[in-house]
């Protein structure tokens, strides 16, 4: 199957929202062995949408649309496709009843145009919307499969996973099982990682190896096909073993795992508590950690010590250090980590201090970072020189904190 994703909505062209739907769908289609060759974005204009469909059906046999299924006049996806394919729009009774029930339960008036959301293409396979009003739909015309999905990701993603993906798998009539596994790496660049496993990438057949760099991390997606799922997993195991034999020090987890979730799990496993002193990161590290369920079992507390006054008066960094070496220094990071550990009575204390930019600080350039980690066995400090904008430096600093803690805990 050759797939094309057409996102409909002027807000996408204006840059008001990001096209995360295309990213999600491309990932999901890759997992089931469907190749996506084109991404197209079209505004709320029936003529331009018609042209995009005419082009797409000449080069693709699966076209997935997102957006344009709402109740307003600029929601034209169904109407445009119906006209092109010479299909009528008919009322889906189940969807209509669901819409009526929603307005009845919420005691809100229903506009006449809400009925439009329950219309589907004649002869289509209806994809139920359990998180919104407008159903999706799929149909095959002249050997081209058209799938229409709502625009809001909170509606589109569960609809595709529960109804759209199974529909496509059934249409493909493929006996092979497709298994994917993502390996996650940190503290190694994409080019270095590819160099280390270049021969494996060059020789890939089944499984395939797909590298991707994002936010200071690198991932490898391994995908294998076999009639038996167990054999597909075994093929992936073999390739994973060969990869990790070369780059294991940089590997930290699988699939949707993050450095923060890995750290949380490891702290729980080791029965350790953590306290945090954040200057450079301004609470970002704790924000990421406490967003995870059960974080309270390992996070003892923290201090956002953005000013020297707080560093000195709350975390008792000696004035002499701040005056002679500055807040962005090894000794300051060491003192912050040790004293936040004492303050919160935790097993481990970690500190972050540095220069996020856009201007230099204390004569130190943007990207200068110090991290301190204090335990009962002593204190270690780590110096970094990072690049990127302010937010990138802060996030990478927080991730390096996770990385160094994981190294210590293992």
From Swiss-Prot:
Listed SUPFAM superfamilies: CinA-like, Molybdenum cofactor biosynthesis proteins
Pfam families associated with the record: CinA (PF02464), CinA_KH (PF18146), MoCF_biosynth (PF00994)
Signal peptide: none
Recorded family membership: Belongs to the CinA family.
Protein name: Putative competence-damage inducible protein
Organism from which the protein derives: Anoxybacillus flavithermus (strain DSM 21510 / WK1)
Gene: cinA
